[in-house]
């Protein structure tokens, strides 16, 4: 496929940087939209801005063929305004900029938290509904944002798709495994249940590859999570 211009929000983060790396390997031009131009993958250009500022987002996305919207505020604790400002308003700004500038493809990084309702999920798939009541500001803001992304599919020629990777780990992981290992070393790692509980985790390479495949097959995947 011909080289394209891609914008990656959160492209200096753990998953975002791996997506940027994959795009650069393909020969694409890559712009990283981030609050700070730190840890910029070599070969990418930086556009510093705030997702909550429509002008910042619009300026970054202008001229892009594809946008990977990876940036988000994650976590269980924190002010509602912060989660909704970054995750929902920020996503609305990304969608508006895609429509404004005629972007062809939008790949959104969501989370399985959008369908979690306290009960265990065994063999769950894309047909799971959003819960009646969300357990965290994070889950609610991401679900509402995902909904906006999927509703934008087909508007002004935009093709949009959402992915829900869970607990991303791998080389350079700044959060998940380091915390687990640190708690284990301190004897603070708690077992929940009888020890047979399972949790799905996603290697960062697989998560990045999934984003590139979503772009490659977006004519089939568009409008879906």
Question: Where do the protein language model's features map onto the residues?
Answer:
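N-terminal Rossmann NAD(P)H-binding glycine-rich loop of SDR-like oxidoreductase domains
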Residues: 6-26
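NAD(P)H-binding glycine-rich loop region in Rossmannoid oxidoreductase-like domains
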Residues: 38-39, 48-89, 97, 115-117
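Conserved Rossmann-fold NAD(P)-dependent oxidoreductase catalytic core, especially the SDR/UDP-sugar
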Residues: 89-138
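Active-site Tyr-X1-5-Lys
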Residues: 133-161
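Glycine-rich "substrate-gating" loop/helix at the edge of Rossmann-like oxidoreductase active sites
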Residues: 134-136, 166-174, 194-205
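Glycine/proline-rich active-site loop of Rossmann-fold NAD(P)-dependent oxidoreductases
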Residues: 143, 156-158, 169-179, 213-225
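Alpha-helical substrate-binding/gating segment
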Residues: 181-190, 199-225
